[in-house]
């Protein structure tokens, strides 16, 4: 039977998003790039097979699930494994299958603690266990590449098209013009793809920032509600919350007001 883990609080043992993905990819030999890709449930099923061989029907797991109902089916397999091994944890399937960062990140943080409490270090071949299939669902990757779509890319190249159209009548050889245009399109497509990747990276970092900021804000509210109790522990927490780096200077609140008066 499994060792249950009930703590869900944020501690220094919690991994960051990047470290969590690195652990998952290394353990299961995957190439996940986003926490949201865990919404298919397939990775959790394989981790259960690693911890407790035979606890889940791995043949029923759809490692290349594309649709929400397929994700739900995978989580049903996981729930059956939890029940079989006595894992006292309710899986928020409805939230996880939506692919939201915060819900999936909270669950995988718990699962990592559960894994550490039950893993005995035995060898496991994840590729052979899933018969060589990858768990990155195509529809989870496709929106990332198609999100900007080609119309956005052609918008930046729009000013160049009239120039090409004006030069075409003057040049007797239209074929060379087409070749140059194709080469330019390829270069533009490459740059646009790089921009899109950077935008997605920023988006992920902002989600992670907001996630932890929300937790810090909740802690701050709890401390403020119990401010009059003179609890040394709460006072210490408040000191940590409001502590600043050495040399940090709080901006002068009067400066913005002076700028407003000038207008």
UniProtKB/Swiss-Prot annotation:
Residues 14-116 form the Calponin-homology (CH) domain. One of its GO terms (molecular function) is microtubule plus-end binding. Keywords: Cell cycle, Cell division, Cytoplasm, Cytoskeleton, Golgi apparatus, Microtubule, Mitosis. The gene is MAPRE1. Residues 150-182 are annotated as: Disordered. The keyword Cell cycle applies. Its main location: cytoplasm. Plus-end tracking protein (+TIP) that binds to the plus-end of microtubules and regulates the dynamics of the microtubule cytoskeleton. Promotes cytoplasmic microtubule nucleation and elongation. Involved in mitotic spindle positioning by stabilizing microtubules and promoting dynamic connection between astral microtubules and the cortex during mitotic chromosome segregation. GO terms for biological process: attachment of mitotic spindle microtubules to kinetochore; cell division; establishment of mitotic spindle orientation; negative regulation of microtubule polymerization; protein localization to astral microtubule; protein localization to microtubule. PANTHER family: MICROTUBULE-ASSOCIATED PROTEIN RP/EB FAMILY MEMBER. GO terms for cellular component: centrosome; cortical microtubule cytoskeleton; Golgi apparatus; microtubule; mitotic spindle pole. SUPFAM superfamilies: Calponin-homology domain, CH-domain (SSF47576), EB1 dimerisation domain-like (SSF140612). Residues 180-250 form the EB1 C-terminal domain. The keyword Cell membrane does not apply. Belongs to the MAPRE family. It is found in: Cytoplasm, Cytoskeleton; Cytoplasm, Cytoskeleton, Microtubule organizing center, Centrosome; Golgi apparatus; Cytoplasm, Cytoskeleton, Spindle. This is Microtubule-associated protein RP/EB family member 1. It comes from the Eukaryota.
